[in-house]
Amino acid sequence: MGGWSIALHGGAGDIPFSLPPERRKPREEGLRHCLQIGIEALKAQNPPLDVVELVVRELENIQHFNAGIGSVLTNSGTVEMEASIMDGNTMKCGAVSGLNTVMNPISLARQVMDKTPHIFLAFQGAQDLGKQQGVETVDSSHFITEENVERLKLAIEANRVQVDYSQYNYTQPVQDDAEKELPLANGDSQIGTVGCVAVDSHGNLASATSTGGLVNKMVGRIGDTPLIGAGTYANELCAVSATGKGEAIIRATVARDVAALMEFKGLSLKEAADCVVHERTPKGTVGLIAVSAAGEIAMPFNTTGMFRACATEDGYSEIAIWPTA
C-alpha cells in the first residue's frame, strides 16, 4: 500500500474563467482550510471514515458552498439538505435527505450508519433520529440567507432550477430533460456540493458527500448525493464522491461505476474515473474525486471547472478550479 491520500471538492459546473476574485478566493480559502484539517487528521492516524466526516462537516459550515449553512432553497423557499457517507473497509454506509434543522447533515448520515439497522432515512424520521442522538439542530430559519432568497427569486422568475456552479443564470427549465443542452449566461451561481474521499497508509478507504440540492427544486426532490453508488461510494478498491447534475449522476451510477471498472475490467483509478466522466456521462454534467487503496488520486470533470483540492503523504498538494493541463 502507498501512504495516505485525501481529496475534496466544492462542486463542479460551468465556472467562468472570469470568476471575480471576491467569489473565487473565499472558496479556495475554504478548500485550503478543510484540506489542512484532513491532512492533520490523517497524520494523526485517524480512521478515513472519521476524516471524511470531519472535513465535510467543516465544508458544511462554510456559507460559500451549497451544503449545510450555504444550502440553496426549494421552490417553496425552504431548505432540504442531504448527505451520505460510506466506509470502504466494512461497506457500511448511511444517508439522509429532506433535512431543514440539522446543522451538519453528514454527521446525521454517520448516525444512521452507526446507530440504526438502516442505510437511508429521510425528512422527519431522519431529524427525529438526530434529536435522539444529540445531533446539533437549529431553527429552519437559520438556513434562509438573503443571498439564497435572491437566488431563488431569480430562478422562479425564469421558471428554472439552478445547478451547481452554473453561471449567474445558467439554469435548466423546470420541465426540460436534464441532459438537453442548456443556455449560457455570464457570471457564477456561487453554489457547489461538497465531498471528501480519503485513504490511510493501510489502504482503508472512505467517502462522504453533502449538498443542499438545486435552487428552485421541487419539494421532496432527492438528488444523487445521498444515493449510495451514485453520488457516494467506497469499497476495498476506491472511494468516490461525485458532483454536478444529480439526475445525470444517478442515471450513470457514477460513483459505483468507477469501482466496477476497477473491479471487473482491471482499470486503474485514473482510467476508470476518466472513462465514467468522459465517456459515460453527458458533457457539462459531472465531476468527481476519487482515491484508490494504493493512494492514487483522480479528479476528472467534464464541466468547465470543479473546485477541488488534494494532498498525499509524500508532500504533494493541489488546489484548483479549472483544468491544469
Curated annotation (Swiss-Prot):
Give the UniProt keywords, A-Z: Autocatalytic cleavage, Hydrolase, Protease
Catalytic reaction list: Cleavage of a beta-linked Asp residue from the N-terminus of a polypeptide
PTM characteristics: Cleaved into an alpha and beta chain by autocatalysis; this activates the enzyme. The N-terminal residue of the beta subunit is responsible for the nucleophile hydrolase activity.
- Molecular-function annotations in GO: beta-aspartyl-peptidase activity; hydrolase activity, acting on carbon-nitrogen (but not peptide) bonds, in linear amides
- Report the active site residues: 193 (nucleophile)
EC number(s) per entry: 3.4.19.5
Q: Please give the Pfam families that the UniProt record associates with this protein.
A: Asparaginase_2 (PF01112)
Note whether Ribonucleoprotein occurs among the keywords.
no
Positions of substrate binding: 221-224, 243-246
Q: What class of enzyme is it?
A: hydrolase
Instruction: Indicate the quaternary assembly.
Output: Heterotetramer of two alpha and two beta chains arranged as a dimer of alpha/beta heterodimers.
Q: Which family does the record assign?
A: Belongs to the Ntn-hydrolase family.
Report the protein name in the record. Answer: Isoaspartyl peptidase/L-asparaginase
Question: Could you say which residues are annotated as the site Cleavage?
Answer: 192-193
Query: What InterPro entries does the record tag this protein with?
Result: Ntn_hydrolases_N, Peptidase_T2
Per the entry, what this protein does is: Acts in asparagine catabolism but also in the final steps of protein degradation via hydrolysis of a range of isoaspartyl dipeptides.
Keyword Signal listed? The answer is no
**Superkingdom of this protein's organism:** Eukaryota
Q: Kindly state a single biological-process term from the GO annotations of this entry.
A: proteolysis
